[in-house]
């Protein structure tokens, strides 16, 4: 199965309605601190694991979600590019229910993104 693109509003709906779904935010620590982070009531549903310049991404990912091979996993970055690469990478190691949030946290040329769609977020 290949990575599917999904908009932030649909991803949010699936995240809050499915106990087997979680979000991996692959932005940098600076982005999390300066721009904000997604907020979900269930804190265990959001994983912060930077993709950029992280040679240990796979090991770190597996140490956090090793028992969730059948989970629905949403990947998020600023605009949908890094998250797509990370989602493909994780799909290639055996996780089959991976989605890329194509409009990202801040949006892109076509779409608003998590923050501009007024989905829950915080600093």
Curated annotation (Swiss-Prot):
CDD domains: RHOD_1 (cd01522). SUPFAM superfamilies: Rhodanese/Cell cycle control phosphatase. Residues 17-117 form the Rhodanese domain. PROSITE patterns: RHODANESE_3. Disulfide bonds: none annotated. PANTHER family: RHODANESE-LIKE DOMAIN-CONTAINING PROTEIN 4, CHLOROPLASTIC. This is Uncharacterized protein RC0915. It comes from Rickettsia conorii (strain ATCC VR-613 / Malish 7).
């Amino acid at each position: 199965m290949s990575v599917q693109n999904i908009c932030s509003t649909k991803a949010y709906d699936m995240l809050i309605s499915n106990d087997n779904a979680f979000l991996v935010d692959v932005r940098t620590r600076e982005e999390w601190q300066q721009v904000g982070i997604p907020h979900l009531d269930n804190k265990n549903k959001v994983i912060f694991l930077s993709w950029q310049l992280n040679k240990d991404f796979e090991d770190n990912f597996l140490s956090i979600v090793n028992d969730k091979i059948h989970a629905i996993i949403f990947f998020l970055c600023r605009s949908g590019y890094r998250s797509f690469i990370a989602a493909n990478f994780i799909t290639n190691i055996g996780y089959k229910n991976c989605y890329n949030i194509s409009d990202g946290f801040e949006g892109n040329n076509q779409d608003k993104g998590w923050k501009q769609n007024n989905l829950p977020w915080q600093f």
